[in-house]
Amino acid sequence: GIARDAAGRGVSVALVEQGDFGGATSSASTKLIHGGLRYLEQYEFRLVAEALAEREVLLRIASHIAWPMRFVMPHAEGLRPSWMIRAGLFLYDHIGGRISLPRSESVRLARDGAGAGLAPRYRSGYAYSDAWVDDARLVVLNLRSAHAHGAQLLPRTRFVSAQAREGRWRATIEHASGARETIEARTLVNAAGPWVDVVASAAGGRSQRASVQLVKGSHIVVPRIHPQPHAYILQNDDRRVIFLIPYERDFTLIGTTDVRVDSIEASRTIDDDETRYLLRAANRYLARPLAERDVVWSYTGVRPLYDDGSNDPSEITRDYTLELRTFDGAAQLDIYGGKITTYRRLAEAALDRLAPHLSYRRGSWTHAEALPGAPSDRVAARAELHARYPQLPRVLLDALFRRHGTLTAQLLGDATTLEALGEDFGGGLYERELRWFVENEWACSADDVLWRRSKAGLHMSARLRERVGQLFAESEKIA
């Protein structure tokens, strides 16, 4: 987000990423664009208001990868009283200013499918609106926009160190080949997520005033538990909530956990206790209990939260903190915390802080310019795609549209039949789209394609996934 905003203001930008773009925390969220209903209990009113306002912006500028979703909260005896939930939802409806989504309401769960999949003892609840986003696609589309505005993007490139001298940084970076290079810059923005303190130490030094608290969040994916389009937000007896979200047509996404951790490297996968926690929290409400054998996939991310001294990981603020320091006249901005919903506002705040050190050709602009592929009218754009490619299955066209929006026609070109799309890898992934990911979205491995640029891996057998991996191992075949 910062690279896109800065490049669009005429700043010369080089972005260094040690792995794949979105390969860590950015693609491991619960994939919600939301104010955060539970943050009202922590009196984070400014954060909630800002996030709700941003929800409106993102639904407009990323309309093909973000869409409204209705959330149902069953009333659970012995947990939050009805008056508290109603008061919170009333505030949630109004604190973000003008909104386009339907407001909250009380619901009878047996009516209109609102309680589909739930145990019959849950008879009443509440419904409200938020939104869902494909987080990994959001990363890639921001980078496509940044690149179009002139940013130099360097994936699989490690930041080694930087020294400040006479108002400029000399940064050493290491490419995947092992070759090292030195680049110069007036400012250094440290948006390394869980590695923010590591990068700070390799540059001007760690901040004495701010530090990161690492919190592990894991999710599981199970076969879809109900056919309705709404998600569930379920209260747990530890006062946390978990989400059950329709996911990739055939599945339900369940998350998240909050576990304080000391090491990033030891926290890359879900552990058994987290799996059992999520299943137990869901099974309290479900008519058909889930078992560990139902889990078809899981993923884990480490959140780099600003350490505000909270003992409970769930109570640590999700707001962002920007720490600006100068070394021999060169500026270093370290970024702590933040959530995906407010990434664009964080970028604006970062550029505001850096304004004394940089020259901008224009002011804030990312609220007004759509991300690549975002249509102004999603329904009309999808209908136009169907009409243009009548021989291709609509389910395939719709999946492509949800990833690429109006760029789908550019991807397909003159390929009007399935045969023209090249090899069928299964899971709705064809050779033509795979090449698009490689040539236009910096994909270099099977994981980049199957689990981030798309989620085709969920719909494929292990044998088919291995075929994609083999293709990348024989990289000349997709070069």
Regions found by a protein language model. Name each.
Residues 190-206, 348:
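Flavin (primarily FAD) binding-site architecture
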Residues 183-193, 282:
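Short hydrophobic core segments
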Residues 5-29:
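Glycine-rich FAD pyrophosphate-binding loop
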Residues 92-144, 152:
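Short linear elements at protein peripheries
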Residues 122, 129, 135-138, 145, ...:
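C-terminal catalytic lobe of FAD-dependent flavoproteins
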Residues 126-187, 345:
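Helical element adjacent to the flavin cofactor pocket in flavoenzyme catalytic cores
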Residues 7, 52, 147:
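Anion (oxyanion) recognition and catalysis
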Residues 31-114:
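Dinucleotide-binding Rossmann-like beta1-alpha1 core, especially the glycine-rich loop
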